[in-house]
Amino acid sequence: MEETFVPFEGIKNDLKGRLMCYKQDWTGGFKAGFRILAPTTYIFFASAIPVISFGEQLERSTDGVLTAVQTLASTAICGMIHSIIGGQPLLILGVAEPTVIMYTFMFNFAKARPELGRDLFLAWSGWVCVWTALMLFVLAICGACSIINRFTRVAGELFGLLIAMLFMQQAIKGLVDEFRIPERENQKLKEFLPSWRFANGMFALVLSFGLLLTGLRSRKARSWRYGTGWLRSLIADYGVPLMVLVWTGVSYIPAGDVPKGIPRRLFSPNPWSPGAYGNWTVVKEMLDVPIVYIIGAFIPASMIAVLYYFDHSVASQLAQQKEFNLRKPSSYHYDLLLLGFLTLMCGLLGVPPSNGVIPQSPMHTKSLATLKYQLLRNRLVATARRSIKTNASLGQLYDNMQEAYHHMQTPLVYQQPQGLKELKESTIQATTFTGNLNAPVDETLFDIEKEIDDLLPVEVKEQRVSNLLQSTMVGGCVAAMPILKMIPTSVLWGYFAFMAIESLPGNQFWERILLLFTAPSRRFKVLEDYHATFVETVPFKTIAMFTLFQTTYLLICFGLTWIPIAGVMFPLMIMFLIPVRQYLLPRFFKGAHLQDLDAAEYEEAPALPFNLAAETEIGSTTSYPGDLEILDEVMTRSRGEFRHTSSPKVTSSSSTPVNNRSLSQVFSPRVSGIRLGQMSPRVVGNSPKPASCGRSPLNQSSSN
């Protein structure tokens, strides 16, 4: 993204670029037909369950002022508006954990002030949203998104681990509360007797750990040996919501003399019940807030503005990674401006604001990449079969596929249809294997399934329909509140723990923490699997010092969230990492080491073959995963980043790609080869090339 700080320049460029493809955003989605429902349903479950969980967390933290009704309504309204008039339709909006934390701090502050109290909390938070919106307007107009790249991996991964800790904290706190008598409840009820409280707590542990373990297991279903491919894909994509249903069903097993309140379930008023819509008229009470608190609302608003600026922009950035080969322009500045209007609207409606969320945004793009792959593959396979039936030559077959590929694209007038060029280059490479390009072709010469898989690049079905549909479905959950209230709260605590653990793989900060606790005699095992490149290029002592710095900073941020009033300042600590990384860390670490430890992209090295004989034997019988499994493996689960496979030079901090560099300039990443660090599987072999077996700093430190 080009840096521009001329007022309104970034917004103007974003609007100009997105308006040119606005019509195509809709027609492309409708042309996909019913196939668009698969990514829509996938991202709906990924959005709805966390929002329901955050609603239960807010209900407890705000004494019932805010519930799942408000979090679902905010997510639905903001999502629908963004999908219609937003810049980047791949970006998913929703109420996020940082917003819940900030609103918890604000409620505790208001509750402790007689001038505000519980009754004026929403009115005061409305003023906070007004100030937040004004600051977001200023940031968008001045082009602040131009410097989002200065938030390096240090800040992003530390923030991610902080959120994981807060998720786990909420899960533990919720489970402990299952053994206690809830506030605002009649303590004389049978279910609150000591014996029944203990029974409720133990049953809550069963439900929570049941969801956690089965949810984690289902995420790896695509690599299972059992079941058909479609069944494994179904479990991998929808296993977590299915497990929520399963364990909710298990919660209804107790019967007979068991009190009705065991286990405890989600509490929220129905949206049509008397008093449930009091939030929507909060704007009438905003003038009742004392002037000193209206001015004072600027302090938490500045923290929320910083938080949204960072979180929203990074979510949009991860949804538009270059490996997705997106054809349409970005819209960082305009989307931040729109977020300001959405925040203002939410404040006036008395609901918590929504912003871009991680990892749902890159998950949305990934699901649409799978859809585009399926659509392209079906069209090209049908074209190839028709060409073979008419005894076409190899050259004619590729010409026909080029034409079919061209019809599948609706490129903008100012963009080049890169797919046509790549098919042409693939054809040239194919002649080295097949001989005469004009020779007759049949299925023994041209393996339709394999050859077309090799030709297809990673592309995304960029459109607005899936985002609009999933937001509408989230809104439908508000009407389904009587059904949602059947979910046990302990299942939601298990889901919080699931989100915490699920966010750790792919976080290099977490991987370094694990490395510090690995016995020196066992560190070589890290090298036997795909691993971060810094493991081979940076001395272990430097890795340890850098990790200790990050851990200390993380604990300071986490400790800050425990301080009643000062806790609202934790986003400022994340922003402070920019000057710390730019000016302070270079004084203590070598630039080359910092470049590897704080790489802009997620880079990893292939496994080092410590047992070459065993590797050869295994490699001769290895079968390769399907494309959907590859897309799961190629992206980190914590932030939805693409993994970049490279073979680092032990003597240098720089890395050289495993594949031929000249090929990387011709071919875009393929679905069937990107995980293996290849650019074109039809030119390069389908197995990763082993890295040099030189001694890495990790080996040297562990051999002592």
From Swiss-Prot:
Topology with regard to the membrane?
A: Multi-pass membrane protein
One of its GO biological process terms is: borate transmembrane transport
* InterPro entries reported for this sequence: HCO3_transpt-like_TM_dom, HCO3_transpt_euk
- Gene3D superfamilies in UniProt: Helical hairpin bin
Leader sequence residues: none
Segments on the Extracellular side according to the record's topology features: 57-75, 142-155, 217-233, 311-337, 502-557
Q: What is its main location?
A: membrane
Q: Name one GO cellular component term.
A: vacuolar membrane
Q: Where is the composition biased (Low complexity)?
A: 647-664
Print the keywords alphabetically. Anion exchange, Cell membrane, Endosome, Ion transport, Membrane, Transmembrane, Transmembrane helix, Transport, Vacuole
Gene Ontology MF, one: active borate transmembrane transporter activity
Q: Which residues lie on this side of the membrane: Cytoplasmic?
A: 1-35, 97-120, 177-195, 255-289, 359-480, 579-704
Where does the UniProt annotation locate this protein? Cell membrane; Endosome membrane; Vacuole membrane
Q: Where are the transmembrane segments?
A: 36-56, 76-96, 121-141, 156-176, 196-216, 234-254, 290-310, 338-358, 481-501, 558-578
Expression sites by tissue:
Expressed in proximal side of various root cells, notably in the columella, lateral root cap, epidermis and endodermis in tip and elongation zones of the root. Also detected in the epidermis, cortex, endodermis, and stele cells of the root hair zone. Observed in cotyledons and hypocotyls.
Relate the outcome reported for changing G86E: In bor1-1; reduced boron uptake
Q: What Pfam families would the database entry show?
A: HCO3_cotransp
The reported effect of S74P is: In bor1-2; reduced boron uptake
Entry superkingdom = Eukaryota
Q: Where is this region: Disordered?
A: 641-704
Which family is this sequence assigned to? Belongs to the anion exchanger (TC 2.A.31.3) family.
- What exactly does this protein do? Efflux-type boron (B) transporter for xylem loading, responsive of boron translocation from roots to shoots under boron limitation. Boron is essential for maintaining the integrity of plants cell walls.
The entry's protein name is Boron transporter 1
Which organism does this sequence originate in? Arabidopsis thaliana
Name of the gene encoding the protein in the UniProt record: BOR1
